[in-house]
Swiss-Prot record:
Organism: Mycoplasma genitalium (strain ATCC 33530 / DSM 19775 / NCTC 10195 / G37)
Reactions it catalyzes: D-sedoheptulose 7-phosphate + D-glyceraldehyde 3-phosphate = aldehydo-D-ribose 5-phosphate + D-xylulose 5-phosphate
MF annotations from Gene Ontology: metal ion binding; transketolase activity
Gene3D superfamilies given in the database record: 3.40.50.920, 3.40.50.970
Keywords (A to Z) from UniProt: Calcium, Magnesium, Metal-binding, Thiamine pyrophosphate, Transferase
GO cellular component terms, semicolon-separated: cytosol
Protein name: Transketolase
Binding site for Mg(2+): D150, N180, V182
Keyword Magnesium tagged: yes
SUPFAM superfamilies: Thiamin diphosphate-binding fold (THDP-binding), TK C-terminal domain-like
Plastid is among the record's keywords: no
SMART domains reported for this sequence: Transket_pyr
């Protein structure tokens, strides 16, 4: 037990040094992490993101010091990094933060999402294992472990993702519950009254209950590995054990004091000094956690050597390297669409068909709307065919997004998912977390404006684009035709470290002669030009057609008009000043048009003489889509009034 106590002592000291932290879980759940990492967990100390490593997700991320203490004694985190806990060091931040070169498999902290990402990791593993089973059944035979707290299990997303894990029989998933019956404001029983055994068994899980004795946790994990179902292990723990706030909800977060250290030393019969731990402890951890990994990695490398001449091996390496350039560069042809003058969602179907080949590693998730959004490759799904690229999630948008993040974190897979734009809010917390981790997930949102029509204001998403654009590292495309759609689709396929969102229409849009897929990647470009224009009109998506119609009216009045198509305002705002000044004219007026409440359009005011914006700032109604669109001011008469006011 002294090795476990050493990690707990380090945890207390590191949190005291940081001037406070989540002592309760970091101490109480430490037997879970200790048993896992000293007996079961497989990874490569020299290659943190080795494809066949076990994955560990601390969904209750506030217990991070329990993990960092083990990493320190095993030689994976330095003394200096421990001393910087919560003070600017990514490897020991308050909540675990994923990086491409560290030993954290997912950024966590927003409760429930770690559970969902773990489900995504195991789903990705299952898909990859099936894809390459002809090579070997040992290429993807790892486990994913996730530690959850009571807060994780109270979040709605945990219910969503646990059903998915049960439906798809993700038996490589082992969830360990830090069941301490206490949370920040109260005892758990005051806010939760469910039977966890019944809850998980009802959705196809294996359930195990144990106390926090190391040997019992060990045996529970061994038993879980023998199951053909995902396993939920409820571990009875004690929050802030061996401190003055033991088993009290005040123990969730506090600053350890001298009384705590005296209590700890008395109850554990230890006498450690902060960062003056015996060499024998470091030696034991390196032998127990690190040295046992060598044979596992050596066996895997030998397996790869034996497979390198197999026909599937090149595909395997392209997939696990996430070499999206090799997989998708020059795969799309904007000219090969079934029908022009279509809704931009229809082009999605065309482009998905173009990359529907055995080398593509794209998998599509949808929230029960594939027949409306066309986020689907072929006609089957995973329930019917283990080789299918389509994964039905049901009406679980938040679960879908957390699972997508987990699949991207696992590696080897490109993942696309989506729903109607009005429901992007359901996924927003996971979109934000994926962007924070620089994950190349790909969202498609359709039904993007008032012209959804009869479904009414609940389905008319005037307010969603600014929400998506406001998230750092999220690249939002709103194309106006097939060429711009192709560019946005291609950008999403090739992205290595950025979340891509493609926003598409349900209503048909006319194909436009002068649109340009290459220029689309600048975010905006001149679609129609007149030198020394009196007026510049900039628009995105369906409003580009309205701009073209208005230009025809003004041309008859001898007004010189320049039209800018702006399919990606975020990319455009990142262009240099020279390019931006080439689009605008200091002597011209500017009208910007978009059926959304986005504020970014006002950033262009400084480049022109004066500026007015036609946007959408109110809910719609249930009526004919074109009628609602017109009533909300997206018509030639309204534009003429705006132009007249600018001239005056």
């Amino acid at each position: 037990m002294k090795y476990l106590y050493a990690t707990q002592h380090l945890t207390l000291n590191a949190i005291k040094h940081a001037k406070g932290g989540h002592v309760g879980m970091a101490i109480g759940a430490s037997p879970i992490l200790f048993s896992l990492f000293t007996k079961h967990f497989h990874f490569d100390p020299d290659q943190p993101k080795w494809i066949n490593r076990d994955r560990f997700v601390l969904s209750a991320g506030h217990g991070s010091m329990a993990l960092y203490s083990i990493f320190h004694f095993a030689g994976l985190i330095s003394k200096q990094e421990i001393l910087q806990h919560k003070h600017g060091q990514i490897n020991t931040s308050s909540h675990p933060e994923y990086a491409p070169n560290n030993f954290i498999d997912a950024s966590t902290g927003p409760l429930g999402q770690g559970f969902g990402m773990a489900v995504g990791m195991v789903l990705a593993q299952k898909l990859l294992a099936n894809e390459f089973k002809e090579l070997s059944d040992k290429l993807f035979d790892h486990y994913t472990y996730v530690v959850v707290g009571d807060g994780d299990l109270q979040e709605g997303v945990s219910y969503e993702v646990s059903q998915i894990a049960g439906l798809y029989k993700l038996n490589k998933l082992i969830v360990l519950h830090d069941s301490n019956r206490v949370q920040m404001d109260s005892e758990v029983k005051k806010v939760a009254n469910e039977n966890l055994k019944v809850r998980f068994e009802n959705v196809g899980w294996n359930y195990i209950h144990t106390d926090d004795q190391l040997e019992n946790i060990d045996q529970a994990i061994i038993k879980a590995k023998q199951s053909d179902k995902p396993t939920f292990i409820e571990v009875r723990t004690t929050i802030a054990k061996n401190t003055h706030l033991e088993d009290q909800y005040g123990g969730h977060w506090f600053i350890p004091n001298e009384v705590d250290f005296q209590l700890f030393e008395k109850r554990t019969n230890t006498n450690f000094n902060f960062f003056n731990y015996p060499d024998s402890i470091y030696h034991w951890f390196k032998q127990t956690v690190i040295e046992r990994q060598k044979q596992i990695k050596e066996d895997y490398n030998n397996l790869l050597i034996s497979l390198k001449d197999k026909p599937l091996f090149k595909k395997f390496t392209n997939w696990i390297d996430s070499d999206f350039q090799a997989l998708y560069l020059n795969q799309l042809d904007e000219k090969k669409v079934a029908k022009k003058d279509s809704a931009t969602r229809n082009y999605l179907k065309d482009f998905l068909n173009q990359i529907n080949n055995p080398n593509s590693n794209l998998y599509c998730l949808n929230a029960d709307v594939s027949r409306s959004c066309f986020i689907k490759i072929g006609d089957d799904n995973l329930h019917e065919n283990p080789c299918s690229r389509n994964i039905q999630i049901g009406i679980r948008e938040f679960a879908m997004a957390t699972i997508m993040n987990g699949m991207a974190l696992h590696g080897g897979i490109k993942v696309m998912g989506g729903t109607f734009l009005a429901f992007a809010d359901y996924s927003k917390p996971a979109i934000r977390l994926g962007a924070l981790m620089n994950l190349p997930v790909f969202y498609v949102y359709t039904h993007d404006s008032y012209q959804v029509g009869g479904d009414g204001p609940t389905h008319q998403p005037y307010d969603q684009l600014p929400m998506l654009r406001a998230i750092e590292n999220v690249c939002v495309f709103r194309p106006c035709d097939e060429k711009e759609t192709c560019a946005g689709f291609n950008y999403g396929l090739l992205s290595q470290d950025q979340t891509t969102v493609l926003v598409l229409t349900r209503q048909p849009l006319k194909s436009i002669d002068n649109t340009d897929s290459l220029k689309t990647l600048k975010g905006g470009y001149i679609l129609l030009d007149r030198k020394q224009p009196d007026l510049i009109i900039a628009a995105s998506g369906s409003e580009v057609q309205l701009a073209i119609e208005f230009e025809k009216v003004l041309t008859k009045q001898n007004v010189k008009v320049r039209i800018l198509s702006v399919p990606n305002i975020t990319l455009l705002l990142k262009q240099d000043e020279k390019y931006l000044k080439s689009l605008f004219d200091a002597n011209s007026s500017l009208i910007t048009i978009e059926a959304s409440s986005s504020y970014e359009w006002f950033c262009f005011k400084k480049y022109v003489k004066n500026h007015a914006h036609l946007g959408a700032f109110s809910f719609g109604e249930s009526d004919d889509g074109d009628k609602v669109y017109q009533q909300k001011g997206f018509n030639l008469e309204r534009l003429m009034k705006i132009f007249t006011s600018l001239r005056n």
